[in-house]
């Protein structure tokens, strides 16, 4: 039995992993899908001090209080920033890092540095309850998610929540970068995203112990949950 912790990306919540989590649990594995502070069902906690550090600590605390070890830790999109920081703080609890169409930051980089498309979202920056936020159900960046099925869109869109911009602009601080880089890692990429990456970033996305490419949109855990689950199951095999 494997233990999976699946970390969502910007504007999402743990809800986005429901289809994948069902498959993994049916196969007998433990699955945790934490929602980061200020998002999803925790959107009522939105406040000005939420940043990348806090959302990294959200997941570190799950590992600690659920007493999790040998974790297959996966992050989607912005979640790649989060899982990299989690591994830095809880190295001894991680068996694999899995990047789901995700950012793979170096020390001192922010998501804004790693993913230029997020700067399109910054054009929509607004203030909600005193917090600078981007994304949400009405964001013009939502087509990038690649969800086109009407039923999926009707289920997903109302659940998208504004995300504090500070999370995307704060550089990650890694104390154990070499050790984090030495962890086994897998990369599950979406074909359209991979093709759009600059050569250097594309090479980094393919530099992993296990690599998959799925021809689907960015929200692959919703559009291709079986393919994502199959890859995650293969990592545990």
Predicted stretch roles:
Residues 2-43:
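Conserved HGGG/HGGXW glycine-rich cap/lid loop of the alpha/beta-hydrolase fold
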Residues 30, 38-71, 88-89, 116:
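Active-site loop/oxyanion-hole signature of alpha/beta-hydrolase fold enzymes
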Residues 35, 72, 95-98:
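Residue in the alpha/beta-hydrolase core beta-strand immediately N-terminal to the catalytic nucleophile
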Residues 74-75, 79, 83:
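Gly/Ala-rich beta-loop-alpha elbow adjacent to hydrolase catalytic centers
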Residues 88, 92-137, 167-168, 173, ...:
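Flexible "cap/lid" loop of the alpha/beta hydrolase fold
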Residues 158-177, 192-194:
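Active-site nucleophile elbow and catalytic-triad environment of alpha/beta-hydrolase enzymes
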Residues 179-185, 206-209:
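Short, proline-enriched alpha-helix->beta-strand connector loops that line the catalytic pocket
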Residues 189-222, 234-235:
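Conserved loop-alpha-helix segment in the C-terminal half of the alpha/beta-hydrolase fold
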């Amino acid at each position: 039995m494997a233990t999976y912790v699946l970390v969502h990306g910007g504007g999402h919540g743990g809800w986005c992993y429901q289809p994948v989590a069902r498959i993994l649990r049916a196969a007998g594995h433990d699955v945790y899908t934490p929602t980061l502070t200020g998002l999803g069902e925790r959107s009522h906690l939105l406040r000005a001090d939420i940043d990348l550090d806090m959302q990294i600590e959200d997941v570190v605390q799950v590992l600690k209080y659920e007493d999790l070890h040998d974790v297959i830790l996966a992050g989607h999109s912005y979640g790649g920033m989060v899982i990299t920081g989690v591994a830095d703080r809880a190295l001894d609890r991680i068996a694999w890092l899995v990047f789901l169409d995700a950012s793979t930051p170096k020390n001192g980089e922010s998501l804004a540095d790693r993913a230029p498309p997020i700067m399109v979202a910054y054009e929509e920056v607004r203030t909600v309850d005193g917090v600078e936020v981007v994304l949400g159900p009405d964001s013009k960046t939502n087509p990038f998610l690649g969800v086109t099925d009407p039923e999926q869109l009707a289920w997903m869109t109302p659940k998208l929540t504004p995300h504090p911009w500070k999370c995307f602009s704060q550089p990650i601080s890694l104390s154990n970068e070499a050790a984090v880089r030495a962890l086994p890692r897998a990369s599950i990429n979406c074909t359209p995203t991979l093709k759009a990456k600059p050569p250097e970033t594309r090479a980094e996305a393919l530099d992993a112990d296990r690599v998959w490419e799925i021809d689907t949109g960015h929200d692959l855990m919703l559009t291709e949950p079986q393919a994502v689950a199959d890859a995650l199951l293969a990592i545990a095999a």
